[in-house]
Amino acid sequence: MPTSSSFKHRIKEQEDYIRDWTAHREEIARISQDLALIAREINDVAGEIDSVTSSGTAPSTTLVDRVFDESLNFQKIPPLVHSKTPEGNNGRSGDPRPQAAEPPDHLTITRRRTWSRDEVMGDNLLLSSVFQFSKKIRQSIDKTAGKIRILFKDKDRNWDDIESKLRAESEVPIVKTSSMEISSILQELKRVEKQLQAINAMIDPDGTLEALNNMGFPSAMLPSPPKQKSSPVNNHHSPGQTPTLGQPEARALHPAAVSAAAEFENAESEADFSIHFNRVNPDGEEEDVTVHK
């Protein structure tokens, strides 16, 4: 009958509408919970910043470490979708017949939407962490560059001239992007690259160190330690012994060695310069005859 078929078709449309509305309502509830969690997290971080600032410690370190750890530990687990029966008047369902289960396609679409939202949140959190660490790297390289400028201030190499020359040689425009974090990260890394090139030009202007490093001789230019001269005190040791004295010990024993050498010379000057002759008697015994000068 056409009336019954149209009635069934109308009931089916109403069931589909109620099912879609239920899914949308659950999605809105999940989004509200996520927003509440994000707001609570922002309040916690803001409270930590206030406490750290009042204690006199730099808040950037604590905030960056917290954000970086949370971005690495962020788990992208899509929540399960629970089907609910729409309630009508007096807490009864609008249709006495049992509701059909949601089709797999609709469940897959809902989970895919939730998964995409979690991915976006995790990527944004990780991007913010990378931006904070790029600022830390740039601050560290600025300190190193300042030390290099002080170290080579008496040389004929000017840091400002080298830096301006490098900037003019390789000036590449930064790609425009809608993300301020990505643009800032590119600017910080570009600044770090220029600072490293300037440091390399200050330390090795003619490329000698780089050539030695490429040839595999990193210690070819290092001077060899000076050899210590042997003293008369060391000559009295037995042939099997090779005493080694450090430089401070050699300095400490130098006066003693000089005095020992002087005594040795005096002993030689005052030594007995008599000549000993051995003469054999007729009876076969030797006779020691000493002739003094």
From Swiss-Prot:
One of its GO terms (molecular function) is identical protein binding. Coiled coil: none annotated. InterPro entries: Cent_Immune-Sig_Mod (IPR051176), CEP170_C (IPR029300). Residues 227-245 have a biased composition (Polar residues). It holds the Pfam family CEP170_C. Residues 78-110, 217-270 are annotated as: Disordered. Belongs to the CEP170 family. This is Cep170-like protein. It comes from Homo sapiens (Human). The gene is CEP170P1.
